[in-house]
């Protein structure tokens, strides 16, 4: 069997020569390559199979224009706001997602405020648990950073940041039965779980509105970190329950201070 290509100025043909002289229609085997298949017999008695590429709808996507930017961008161009009060960057960003982001910003700031109050409490001279004060101060700063990250995202998507009221937190965290260290850490664990629940609700809003980018942002920037924080504080609660309110609390405080 011999395979050869024959070229001309207008087209090219691929010939298949079978020296056994078997006549067989192979056109069904090549539906996407050719619509014209010819069988011919030469002087030597050999059969020659040849096909020529022809223009069809199946090859338009390969050889024709599949994307016309100036034509397709026209509808987007018509939607570009002309008012200076409207965002130019906003695209497929629902009002519900925008409102949910603002609510989460408020959650992060409120939790940050509570942690800041706890930092001030444990930093008192008559409490003097500097390790716990350090931990809650860092936690407060972290929640504030989360709020700012959400604010940056809101602006990036073309939304409007609307800060809401922050509730005044408690200033006393003394607990007669548990002790202030354990009570404070249990409160922190509850707050972290609450923040995680709020983030999951925000993710649900993003999924409901088919906002893939927002969903990915929440997953990559918040959810993993939140789960890790819950695990860490859970361990701290378990350790404080084990050591009790006395000398063990002081050692736990030193661990946080030196960590």
UniProtKB/Swiss-Prot annotation:
Gene3D superfamilies of this UniProt entry?
1.20.1260.10
Into which EC class is this enzyme placed?
oxidoreductase
Annotated ranges, domain Ferritin-like diiron: 91-244
**GO terms for MF:** ferric iron binding; ferroxidase activity
The chain's transit peptide is found over: 1-57
Q: Which keywords has UniProt assigned to this entry?
A: Chloroplast, Iron, Iron storage, Metal-binding, Oxidoreductase, Plastid, Transit peptide
Give the enzyme's EC designation.
1.16.3.1
- Compartment(s) where it occurs, according to its Swiss-Prot or TrEMBL record: Plastid, Chloroplast
One Pfam family here:
Ferritin
Q: List the disulfide bonds.
A: none
Q: How does it assemble?
A: Oligomer of 24 subunits. There are two types of subunits: L (light) chain and H (heavy) chain. The major chain can be light or heavy, depending on the species and tissue type. The functional molecule forms a roughly spherical shell with a diameter of 12 nm and contains a central cavity into which the insoluble mineral iron core is deposited.
Protein's UniProt name: Ferritin-4, chloroplastic
